[in-house]
UniProtKB/Swiss-Prot annotation:
Source organism superkingdom: Eukaryota
GO MF, one example: oxidative phosphorylation uncoupler activity
Name assigned to this protein: Dicarboxylate carrier UCP2
GO annotations of cellular component type: mitochondrial inner membrane
Disulfide bonds: none
Function: UCP are mitochondrial transporter proteins that create proton leaks across the inner mitochondrial membrane, thus uncoupling oxidative phosphorylation from ATP synthesis. As a result, energy is dissipated in the form of heat.
SUPFAM superfamilies in alphabetical order: Mitochondrial carrier (SSF103506)
Catalytic activity: L-aspartate(out) + phosphate(in) + H(+)(in) = L-aspartate(in) + phosphate(out) + H(+)(out); oxaloacetate(out) + phosphate(in) + H(+)(in) = oxaloacetate(in) + phosphate(out) + H(+)(out); (S)-malate(out) + phosphate(in) + H(+)(in) = (S)-malate(in) + phosphate(out) + H(+)(out); malonate(out) + phosphate(in) + H(+)(in) = malonate(in) + phosphate(out) + H(+)(out)
Entry membrane topology: Multi-pass membrane protein
InterPro entries: Mit_carrier, Mito_Metabolite_Transporter, Mitochondrial_sb/sol_carrier, Mt_carrier_dom_sf
Family under the similarity heading: Belongs to the mitochondrial carrier (TC 2.A.29) family.
Source organism of this protein record: Danio rerio
Mitochondrial matrix-side positions: 33-78, 138-181, 236-269
Length: 310
């Protein structure tokens, strides 16, 4: 990615690593209710559907209808169920997949400043897969907390640590890594589309002198990246969410989950929750990339001031 100006000094790998994780956490704080609504819509119709405190399954309709229903039935706090696991995920996940992207891209280009589309795609796939290897348990927890109804006494998990213990006890160590295959696939796709699209749009805007390396450029690039990513990654995202939230033995594999979805509900099932996915991913990208660019600038400026003698 083209660096943000901080006295024309490029940000270090450490600055990118810390900045990416911090920016992703800030983006999650703003967009978590949209992500929760997306998860509820994606799993609607599963065997363990959300229930309205014993009065039958809750029906979710649309993004804001889902949010409204959750607030009415479960209270406002339900929109942030799983936030702790979500923030744990972003600090370990985004730091790797976004923060190390430029370093891995330079590795593939052998230090050259001219990166082709192939090296960008390879860098995106690599850091996306690496991030899943590090952060998968936190992703499993986040999805399960978002899927469970907060009202009533039938909650699967009561706290983040309780969830880690319960999953490890009932499902074994493998339970914490459930859905790793589809998640690696999803995040390789997401990372390639998201980072490479942002990279290319930003490069094009700067090289054509349509915009300068500032907030409007970052906003436009991030919004475009979010839209492209949602279209390409939605099918894998739905399979990942359903499989990670499924009861033990419900699906034999992620592929079995995908086949069951296709045979029972048709191709449209793979784009279930598309609008909340786009609203969430589009807004998340805007907040994250804008914050990330600002953090890189601020951290490099602070670093320069620290090393500048008075």
């Amino acid at each position: 990615m083209v660096g943000f100006r901080a006295g024309d000094v490029p940000p270090t790998a450490t600055v990118k690593f810390i900045g990416a994780g911090t920016a992703a956490c800030i983006a999650d704080l703003f967009t978590f209710p949209l992500d929760t609504a997306k998860v509820r819509l994606q799993i609607q119709g599963e065997n363990k559907a959300s229930t309205n405190m014993g009065r039958g399954p809750v029906k979710y309709r649309g993004v804001f209808g889902t949010i409204s229903t959750m607030v009415r039935v479960e209270g406002p706090r339900s929109l942030y169920s799983g936030l702790v696991a979500g923030l744990q995920r972003q600090m370990s996940f985004a730091s790797v997949r976004i923060g190390l992207y430029d370093s891995v891209k330079q590795f593939y280009t052998k230090g050259s400043d001219h990166a082709g589309i192939g090296s960008r795609l390879m860098a995106g796939c690599t850091t996306g897969a690496m991030a899943v290897a590090v952060a998968q348990p936190t992703d499993v927890l986040k999805v399960r907390f978002q899927a469970q109804v907060s009202a009533g006494a039938s909650k699967r998990y009561h706290s983040t640590m309780d969830a880690y213990r319960t999953i490890a006890k009932e499902e074994g160590f493998r339970g914490l890594w459930k859905g790793t295959g589809p998640n690696i696939t999803r995040n390789a796709i997401v990372n390639c589309t998201e980072l490479v699209t942002y990279d290319l749009i930003k490069d094009a805007l700067l090289k054509s002198s349509l915009m300068t390396d500032d907030l409007p450029c970052h906003f436009t690039s991030a919004f475009g990246a979010g839209f492209c990513t949602t279209i390409i990654a939605s099918p894998v995202d739905v399979v990942k969410t359903r499989y990670m939230n499924s009861a033990q033995g419900q699906y034999s594999s992620a592929l079995n989950c995908a086949v069951a979805m296709l045979t029972k509900k048709g191709p449209k099932a793979f784009f279930k929750g598309f609008m909340p996915s786009f609203l969430r991913l589009g807004s998340w990208n805007v907040v994250m990339f804008v914050t990330y660019e600002q953090l890189k600038r601020a951290m490099m400026a602070a670093r320069q001031n620290w090393h500048t003698p008075l």
